[in-house]
């Protein structure tokens, strides 16, 4: 990827950005991130897939099939499509007799929607859920909203770059966050790279 993009500090979402001049890593532009999903080596679509130890990404069917959740051993559900329109109507009450912890976010699968407002809370829920695994993160199709939140979790909690997170997840599930979500994940990647650079320079000054 880095050999095909131009190094830039521009805020242009279509430009690549190199945050750390001593690193070979470059945050790709949004269009380059989209291209990562269009190769033929990714996973085929399924209702639910394990994308990280004890972390599952699934669709509406998976979230609604209570017997299937028991078989999977799901203990926590993150509904990335809470609400009434083009969303999954479950809620905490749907799982009251299953000893499942529920967390819902009202996210629209639109490029203009600010899903980054849920990156921190979703990451915290997934992280805490893994002390009592397993967690299902879902939306309607399990491809855009839920995928964006899991990608953010891998970046924020496990230190993956946006490129590494995408490559990891797409090998295990057929996902495709919308263009706006990718733009926000790209911005998160730059922010995390800047944080790490500040930490590195701070340690060098000690």
UniProtKB/Swiss-Prot annotation:
InterPro entries, sorted: Atypical_DUSP_subfamA, Dual-sp_phosphatase_cat-dom, Prot-tyrosine_phosphatase-like, Tyr_Pase_AS, Tyr_Pase_dom, TYR_PHOSPHATASE_DUAL_dom
Location in or out of the cell: Cytoplasm; Nucleus
Gene: dusp29
Chief location bin: cytoplasm
A molecular function GO annotation: protein tyrosine/serine/threonine phosphatase activity
Residue ranges occupied by any Tyrosine-protein phosphatase domain in the UniProt entry: 47-194
Active-site residues per Swiss-Prot or TrEMBL entry: 139
Protein name: Dual specificity phosphatase 29
Coiled coil location: none
């Amino acid at each position: 990827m880095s050999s095909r993009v131009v190094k830039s500090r521009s805020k242009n979402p279509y430009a690549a950005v190199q945050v750390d001049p001593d690193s070979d890593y470059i945050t790709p532009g949004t269009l380059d991130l989209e291209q990562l999903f269009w190769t033929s080596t990714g996973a085929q679509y399924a209702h639910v897939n394990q994308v990280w130890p004890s972390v599952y990404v699934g669709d509406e069917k998976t979230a609604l099939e209570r017997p299937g959740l028991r078989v999977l051993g799901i203990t926590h559900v993150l509904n990335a499509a809470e609400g009434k329109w083009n969303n999954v109507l479950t809620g905490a009450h749907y799982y009251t007799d299953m000893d499942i912890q529920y967390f819902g976010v009202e996210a629209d699968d639109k490029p203009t929607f600010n899903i980054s407002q849920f990156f921190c809370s979703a990451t915290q829920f997934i992280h805490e859920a893994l002390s009592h695994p397993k967690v299902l993160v879902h939306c309607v199709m399990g491809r855009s909203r839920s995928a964006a939140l899991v990608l953010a979790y891998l970046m924020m909690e496990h230190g993956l770059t946006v490129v590494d997170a995408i490559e990891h997840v797409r090998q295990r599930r057929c996902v495709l966050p919308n263009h706006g979500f990718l733009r926000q994940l790209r911005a998160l990647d730059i922010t995390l790279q800047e944080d790490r650079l500040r930490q590195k320079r701070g340690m060098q000054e000690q």
